[in-house]
Amino acid sequence: MKVALGLVLGLVVGGVTLRLLLPTLAAPVLQRTNHRGAPIATAAGLVVVLAVLGAEAALGVVEAAGFDPLGGAVGRRLVVLATVGFGLLGFIDDLLGAGESGGFRGHLGALAHGRLTSGGVKLFGGAALALAGLLFGCAAAA
């Protein structure tokens, strides 16, 4: 039941967030041309970040009223940490990335040649977030 409630809440908040953000995602600064020449929104991950924050805010209000519909506050905090952290790293990559090195292999290749790309920052930042989440989760479980 908790999984179904979480899924429904996430879908509703995500759908509303997407509808609200569609005009923003169409802004030229957030558009790139893909390999087929079609324009794509680069910062679509913002929808996920804002949906998670919105759902978490709604759950916070419900919990403040004395209900605990989902439980597992530590796990939810880790999800928020990972989502916001990866979302921020992705947004920085979208805004600052020059498109010179694409994909995991391209960013590692650039690093091997002494260049740190915005995707490389995302790579190392993601690893740091994963480690922080692991340490936080282990400390909370103890």
Where are these regions (language model features)?
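"…together with the soluble PPM/PP2C metallo-phosphatase catalytic core" -> "…together
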Residues: 1-142
